[in-house]
């Protein structure tokens, strides 16, 4: 497995995606993140393992289509993003949940 610079890995993951579907996937140890579009699966795996100190079993990626947005007569597009669904090893789900959803 190639080695990645840990300073660059933190910039790959933008934010966790919390939707109804993502919440249902959390019951199966799958967590959804928004990542930069040029990130590869090995880079995403290394970034999640480095940020959350968990063992990643599998990474699925999805590049949804850009949505049109209109302001008056001007038509533009929302920014492109990539969605990564990361499967975490059994037993590590507590580590990642403590970071994503801290107790208040």
From Swiss-Prot:
Keywords: Ribonucleoprotein, Ribosomal protein, RNA-binding, rRNA-binding. One of its GO terms (biological process) is translation. One of its GO terms (cellular component) is ribonucleoprotein complex. InterPro entries: Nucleotide-bd_a/b_plait_sf, Ribosomal_uL23-like, Ribosomal_uL23/eL15/eS24_sf. One of its GO terms (molecular function) is structural constituent of ribosome. Disulfide bonds: none annotated. The keyword RNA-binding applies. One of the early assembly proteins it binds 23S rRNA. One of the proteins that surrounds the polypeptide exit tunnel on the outside of the ribosome. Forms the main docking site for trigger factor binding to the ribosome. Part of the 50S ribosomal subunit. Contacts protein L29, and trigger factor when it is bound to the ribosome. HAMAP family: Ribosomal_uL23_B. Belongs to the universal ribosomal protein uL23 family. This is Large ribosomal subunit protein uL23. It comes from Nostoc punctiforme (strain ATCC 29133 / PCC 73102). The gene is rplW.
